[in-house]
Regions:
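TOPRIM metal-binding catalytic domain and adjacent DNA-binding surface shared by DnaG-type primases
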Residues: 1-22, 28, 34, 45-132, ...
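Acidic glycine-/aspartate-rich tracts in secreted/extracellular proteins
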Residues: 37-39
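Phosphate-handling DNA/RNA-contact segment within nucleic-acid enzymes
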Residues: 118-209, 224
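Acidic beta-strand-to-loop metal/phosphate-binding motif
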Residues: 171, 208-219, 242
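Short, acidic/turn-prone active-site loops that include or flank metal/cofactor-
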Residues: 192-197, 215-218, 243-245
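Short, surface-exposed amphipathic charged segments that create phosphate/polyanion-binding patches used
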Residues: 203-208, 249-262
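Short, aromatic/basic amphipathic alpha-helical patches
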Residues: 222-233
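A generic structural motif
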Residues: 237-247
Length: 289
């Protein structure tokens, strides 16, 4: 067990919730917790109670450790932040209205995501963040829809201004799906793609129940499943939600059935998994019925 990892403040024990003493397996399939006996498989002398979190078929695969270990998460970039503030200030209501109409999401949802306008590239601006307001990148969405990032950007999350400190949060792929879920009145955070951002999602939503919203395509679903596995250790609770078969993603679902239907489905998931209602913050709903 020399490769088992000690828990810490950003990766607490999933059994007792404490940040010290407990050990977690390299593939996060089991925990040794000296505090909680209930639910354990057996007692390991001198270490604690063994709790099996999931049965894995990956036991023959050696865990890969890149040289230099796990890379540090990107820090706040004030140079990009200065540019973002300027672009947000330069974005008048007509640009917000135009993008709202293009995406069929509410204007309020775009304001919650701090959308700006970069005149030099004729692009809408979406800040990408970590927790605590750290800006680490900027995504540009030109009039032609071909998205790219400002030079020097790192992949971050699309985080609305009204994200609560706890409660149910819906995590989706991309800025437009994030705006769609906000339009439905849900607390939502967006990843830049389906296969990135796991660590900063876990950092941001450690005290939340998380519903990972998967796209219908195979790549999107696989990325969502990987995030679910990661958040089993790093969040208060996690489950996954898919749009109905005829819709490719959350925004497509909103366009097909309207915000009330999406909200009702989201409420049903939260009630079935955690027995609690979806608590939205500032209502961003409007349009897209």
């Amino acid at each position: 067990m020399h490769r088992w990892k000690r828990v810490h403040g950003l990766s607490r024990c999933p059994v007792c919730g404490k940040p010290d003493w407990c050990l977690i397996a390299p593939d996060r399939s089991a925990v040794i917790c000296p505090r909680v006996e209930e639910g354990s498989s057996r007692y390991i002398e001198g270490s604690g109670y063994l709790h099996v979190l999931r049965v894995t078929d990956q036991w023959m695969k050696e865990e890969y450790h890149p040289k230099g270990g796990i890379s540090a998460l990107p820090e706040h970039n004030e140079v990009l932040a200065i540019r973002a503030r300027g672009w947000i200030k330069d974005c008048d209501n007509s640009r917000i209205t135009e993008l709202s109409n293009r995406l069929s999401v509410s204007e309020e949802s775009l304001r919650l995501l701090n959308v700006g306008w970069a005149e030099n590239t004729k692009s809408w601006v979406f800040p990408m963040q970590r927790m605590s307001g750290c800006l680490i990148g900027i995504r540009l969405r030109p009039l032609n829809g071909k998205k790219f990032a400002v030079r020097g950007s790192k992949n971050g999350l699309f985080i609305p201004n009204n994200l609560p400190d706890k409660g149910v949060v819906f995590v989706c792929e991309g800025e437009s799906d994030t705006a769609a879920l906000l339009t439905c009145g849900l607390n939502a955070v967006g990843r830049p793609s389906c296969n990135s951002g796991d660590r900063i999602v876990g950092e941001l939503l450690a005290n939340h129940e998380v519903v990972v919203c998967a796209d219908r395509d195979g790549v999107g679903r696989k990325g969502a499943e990987q995030l679910v596995d990661y958040l089993k250790i790093h969040a208060s609770g996690v489950t996954m939600m898919l749009p109905p078969n005829q819709y490719k993603d959350m925004r497509d679902w909103l366009h097909g059935e309207g915000k009330e239907e999406v909200y009702t489905a989201a409420e049903r998931v939260s009630q079935e998994v955690w027995g609690r209602a979806v608590h939205s913050g500032c209502d961003a709903r409007g349009g897209a019925d």
